[in-house]
Amino acid sequence: MREMGEKRRRGHLNPAGFAGGLHDHEEKKNEEHKLDMSGMSMDALPHLTMSLGQVTILDLSNNNLESIPESIIARLLNVVVLDVRSNQLKSLPNSIGCLSKLKVLNVSGNLLESLPNTIEECRALEELHANFNELTKLPDTLGFELHSLRKLSVNSNKLAQLPSSTSHMTALRALDARLNCLRALPDGLENLANLEALNVSQNFQFLRELPYAVGLLASLRELDVSYNSIAALPDSMGCLTKLARFSAVGNPLVSPPMDVVEQGLDAMRAYLTARMNGGDGKRKKKAWLPKLVKYSTFTARMTPGRTRVHENTEGLLMSDYRSLNGIASPRFLTMLSPRRLFSPRRNSPKHC
């Protein structure tokens, strides 16, 4: 094939059809074998005669593939990174569960409506990227087996909920579920003790509240809940002492009041802590007290490029931060969202 020959001349493939480069994701202990067939305008995979058992990185991205044969996946006994983003895939082969060494899977930019249940058998998986698809649900038991998963990115889909087993992904550090149709977040979020970044922005009219457990995410540093329909933040967020970046722009937020929000994270935490210590908040605190962890005071910094409203607005993403009082239209906001601007093959926003 002309494209493959060109890749060989540029050093992407050695004469056996493998690359001798090293992938940044892995420890540079052993030479990795990369088979790069990206950007070759393939509608189907050719017959591969080389030993796929030696391949550790397989890149099939940016083609027109509508399917991947079960037989090919089953031969990838040592693959660590599998990249099939930006194709026309409507499903993944069930044999993907055979990839016991797989650490990074990227299926973004396809036409997937679901992921096979066998994906939970990829117990070494550390990163799962499934953005810009047609996903309406994730496997219910996904989190029960993927104990090594550190990053889950499922933005720009049609998800109404995340699986309840999400709370079992105890190694998770980053969860990106923006631009979906989430009605609520799963129970047991407080179990995600290592979670540092949570993005559930742009679920528009569907997401109306955050669970109390959000305030028990002891490692959380970044939280984006912008462009939803949230009127009040849970009092427990006063306990997020490590939180350094926060955005709630585009919500009809009334608690905390906007004048408190504009004073910065310290003021917002103080307000929510005061609420938690009195009235109904006091009873909630007693119920959750065994799970709370005390930290020393954290002084956050402003995010570069953002406007400081008051001297103590550290960490808040304050650009155009205001209560919309129910005026914001999800259809209008979606016109400006990354779903419309950056989706590889969608010219109109999805409807849930």
Curated annotation (Swiss-Prot):
The keyword Nucleotidyltransferase does not apply. Widely expressed but at a lower level in seedlings and stems. The keyword Repeat applies. Keywords: Leucine-rich repeat, Repeat. GO terms for biological process: intracellular signal transduction. Belongs to the SHOC2 family. Leucine-rich repeat protein that likely mediates protein interactions, possibly in the context of signal transduction. This is Plant intracellular Ras-group-related LRR protein 1. It comes from Oryza sativa subsp. japonica (Rice).
